[in-house]
Amino acid sequence: MATVPTRSGSPRQLTTKQTGDAWEAQARRWLEGKGLRFIAANVNERGGEIDLIMREGRTTIFVEVRYRRSALYGGAAASVTRSKQHKLLQTARLWLARHNGSFDTVDCRFDVVAFTGNEVEWIKDAFNDHS
């Protein structure tokens, strides 16, 4: 778990949620620096959450952000399991339907931004509704 110094100088532990929010904010800034436009963050639909929704041209991008301190056990990218992919697909499907769209009518893709230690990896089109 990451730590942050307090005003008194002694570190305090961040919650898992705070750590995740910090990495998601960093991923958002990083993607915006690459030219993507922010749409939404922490989108909850029945049974799942999408960390970031971005836009690149006419493409809607659903982004999963992952952080791991080290590359042990495959690093951050390897933690996006088949089960997690399925949940993300379902959540995106519900979000699209809420916004009058579907995988058939909206150009979209699923990206992963993986932070492993000090390294960042952007996996474009990491998976899709046909995988």
Curated annotation (Swiss-Prot):
Domain of life the protein comes from: Bacteria
Signal peptide: none
Residue stretches in coiled coil: none
Listed GO MF terms: nucleic acid binding
Annotated region described as Disordered, given as residue ranges: 1-21
Amino acid composition bias (Polar residues), ranges on this chain: 1-19
SUPFAM superfamilies (UniProt xref): Restriction endonuclease-like
Family per record: Belongs to the UPF0102 family.
NCBIfam families cross-referenced by the UniProt entry: PRK12497.1-3 (NF009150), YraN family protein (TIGR00252)
Official protein name in the record: UPF0102 protein YraN
Organism annotation: Escherichia coli (strain K12)
Lineage: Bacteria, Pseudomonadati, Pseudomonadota, Gammaproteobacteria, Enterobacterales
